[in-house]
Amino acid sequence: MGRIVIAAFKPKPDRQAQLRDVVAKHWGILRAEGLVTDSPRMVMRAGDGTLIEVFEWCSAEAIERAHRNAAVQALWAEFEAVCDYVPLAVLGEAQHPFAEFDAMGL
């Protein structure tokens, strides 16, 4: 059974453009490695510049496989260089029942 995830990436100072580039290729690599479903992903931007990505892993096992996959690990290292992973609760938008974000065309 698929697993929906919502990931929030807060850019490090002066790393907004690099973060956008890494997020742009994230889903494609996961898909090429057979780890995510064909369901379209969504990418949004919060008011503070945090990027939010929503996508569906194929299974809990696929998530585990990602942690042993060289291509995914290399990409995640790129993420760590340009952002911090943050919980949704820190976003101002998450304090409202109907959180709204800017759509990103990635």
Predicted features and spans:
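Short S/T/G/P-rich N-terminal loop/turn motif that feeds into the first structured element of a domain
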Residues: 1-73, 80-106
